[in-house]
Amino acid sequence: MENKWRNFYSNWVSVFGLIILLLLTVTALIGPLIAPFDPEDLEIGRRATAPNAMYWVGTDELGRDVFSRAVTATRVSLLVGIIAAGVSTLVGILVGSLSGFFGGWLDHILMRITEVFQVVPQFFLAVVLVALFGASVLNIIVAIALLTWPIIARLTRSEFLSLKSRQYVDAAYLGGASNTRLIFREILPNAMGPIIVSATLLVGRAMLTEAGLSFLGLGDPSRISLGVMLYQSRPFVQFAWWAALFPGMMIFLAVLSTNLIGDGLNDVINPHLNEEE
């Protein structure tokens, strides 16, 4: 196992993604400490000020410091991505493990439900859900989780179908292990590798979905997120392009970092795939 992680850290692309994500996480945690201005401080006299020594990435159309707002917004966007991916992963693991372990009619019903969610265009469904129930951070998280759990469910099911016939599972069953123990103590820990990789990629996907919803005007107006910043800067992009460029770059870096880390973890968990290539 140590050799596998050594391979991860020797892959400069994965390490680069990890460094970016750590920097973004630290920025989100200590945002109020490093923000030079109040993110909601309005100053008409400094409207649409270009980047300079005082305002590092300029101000927006209302005179608010873009850097201070982006630092605060990064926290919200990361939280949405992490929580939505976490909820999606938990639901997917539960559905996939039950489906793969028990099979039969339960597997048939759960997989048909999964297919229903996968048939409907996901972003369109997210727009409908948020429009119906309100543009709040909680509703956005729930909408994203509802759209992405089938990915984890199908992956978990395939892992369970592959692992439940292994000898160590049969030995535990003959030893009197209950179904709960077989699922959560014997099979699931050995199936977690690919699930962790997919969950990592879901964080970036959730952040992109939140940004897309916010860009369409469905973001939480009471919270500053990177997507909300893009939406608010859209009418003024011709003469205050920096107000859209910086939050857009933050979204790009966050999604890029999660994808690079996911690829690195995949190489650690499935080294033979890399060797075959």
What are these regions (language model features)?
Residues 129-132, 144, 159-160, 208-250:
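Glycine-rich helix-loop "coupling/hinge" segments at transmembrane-helix boundaries
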